[in-house]
Amino acid sequence: MSKSQQPRHLKLGAMVHGVGHGWGEWRHPNAQPNASTSFGFYKQQTELAEAAKFDFVFIADSLHIHAKSSPHYLNRFEPLTILSALAAITSNIGLVATVTVSYTEPYQVARQFSSLDHISGGRAGWNVVTSWLSGTADNFGKAEHPPHAVRYRIAKEHVNAVKGLWDSWEDDAFAYNKQSGEFFTPSKLHALNHKGEFFSVKGPLNIARSRQGQPVIFQAGTSEDGRNFAAENSDAIFVHVESIEEGLAYSQDLKRRAKGFGRDPESLSILPGIRPIVGRDEAEVESRYQQAVELVTVEDAIVALGRPFNDHDFGKYPLDAPFPELGDLGSNSQRGGSDRIKQLAKDEGLTLREVALRFSRPKRDFVGTPEQVADAIQTWFERGASDGFIINSVLPDGLQYFTELVVPVLQQRGLFRTEYTGHTLRDNLGLDVPANRYSVAAEVEDKQEALA
């Protein structure tokens, strides 16, 4: 039985986002304004998540900033560096880093993630992004930012090359025979010799596979190109959805596409990002919710709204007029997100102010007492709208409240583990170790010769 055929269990990841996802969260009285460059903060958050038996921690990234970027992105750690440090102080929790394909080389990415995979004992995950902010091109000496469709062609070739490099060494390649002097078996080392539309990579990679075979592939795809890429290549998908109905439709669509690519759809984990606010009783829930609401100003919400539209300046439009007609603006940045915003504004006849606050203020879906938040999580999971969630804390102590109050309820209901049962990120997520392509080919050849 493959791991994907075993009984379903809820999966949980923690987004560690320094001073917060939004523009105003750093102003909370208990917030640590330098959290995004504080190893102590990342250590504390990761230890909370591991103590609660989370599957992984997740570090987002961006390679372009400007004066109005959110505080976290203005001054923060590079993901692979901070995760390598966290690997040394953790034992079981997965470590997922965001790295772009549009401004990196496959050999570089393959080597970096393999190194993290070895340092952590097989707990690395790669969140594949194509980078939607056009200003990124200016930081890498590029004349222009690749168009949306081209970025996904780049992504497919890049990821295929990286996976090929990860298989450079068969699992038993290193003989370490001191008596004979054979350090490795030459026939078990393989050059990739890839030559494609965007990349030329000879290989082989100068580091072996880890105990989990290859790092786990994450991706966030909502556009048509993004959904197809995720369904074909990803092990787990990070997604933003507005409702359980939207989550169910997305999950069904992605798993249908995965099956079309010849994959077991149950091996694919759909993980919506949520921003839960938890209180011990109704009064504390309302108090904490209002704290979060008060951190979002209309001015900040207008700036935040521009991000999926390639940092478009919405400040030039009347706040209380209907949401402006934008044509195809956003189609070459975060297409799925910008299209969803435009469609929602049109369907509900919203003003610019209403749209901005709708997407910046915390939603009520996962706001409540521990039992109420657990109820919402259980409903989404059991209806098939998600296979788990990525927890993005709104308040400075949000992850602590969630791990100490909600996780025990989920455990009591048999939805979430009480102990780790494996050692790798693949173990945590119920994923099989991918076979080395060259070992598989050799086995097939041996069988054919035996039958000849």
Task: Briefly describe each language-model feature range.
Residues 25-40, 98-108, 143-145, 149, ...:
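Active-site mouth loops of central-metabolism enzymes
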Residues 12, 49, 53, 86, ...:
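Conserved, mostly hydrophobic/aromatic
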Residues 6-7, 47-51, 83-91, 117-123, ...:
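Acidic (Asp/Glu)-rich catalytic clusters
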